[in-house]
UniProtKB/Swiss-Prot annotation:
This is RutC family protein BU371. It comes from the Bacteria. Belongs to the RutC family. InterPro entries: RidA, RutC-like_sf, YjgF/YER057c/UK114. It comes from Buchnera aphidicola subsp. Acyrthosiphon pisum (strain APS). PANTHER family: 2-IMINOBUTANOATE/2-IMINOPROPANOATE DEAMINASE RIDA, 2-IMINOBUTANOATE_2-IMINOPROPANOATE DEAMINASE. GO terms for cellular component: cytosol. One of its GO terms (molecular function) is deaminase activity. Pfam families: Ribonuc_L-PSP (PF01042).
């Protein structure tokens, strides 16, 4: 059975979609962009944006009673693959800090993202 996941701890959707959808032991998160839920601001640099996106993903997962180590796949969308080393540094630290293996991942450069952000990440997680 499908269950819509919605938490005020992470930014609300900016379009007609859910933050996440839980289906049995899976959770599928919509792409998250770096909006600070308290200030409603978007950081300027790619490092801060990457960290905030991952933080928002974690907040949605925790609300749904999942953890970072349950993530099995992410897709990273960025407007500048020349910044991949910075993205990878923050991404790697996030998973290590959360005592998690690295999930499967795709990374794609796109021309533009909503609200002119530099990064968006979607995730899928599974737990027994």
């Amino acid at each position: 059975m499908n269950h819509i996941i919605e938490t005020k701890d992470a930014p609300k959707p900016i379009g007609p979609y859910s933050q996440a959808l839980k289906i049995d032991n899976f959770i599928i998160l919509s792409g998250q962009i770096p909006i600070d839920v308290i200030s409603n601001q978007i950081p300027e640099n790619i490092a801060e944006q990457t960290y905030l996106v991952l933080k928002n993903i974690k907040l949605i997962l925790v609300h749904a009673k999942f953890q970072v180590h349950n993530i099995i796949k992410t897709t990273v969308f960025t407007t500048d693959l020349k910044k991949i080393n910075i993205i990878n540094e923050i991404y790697k630290k996030f998973f290590i800090d959360n005592k998690s293996n690295f999930p499967a991942r795709s990374c794609v450069e796109v021309q533009k993202l909503p609200k002119n952000v530099k990064i968006e990440i979607e995730a899928m997680a599974f737990k027994k």
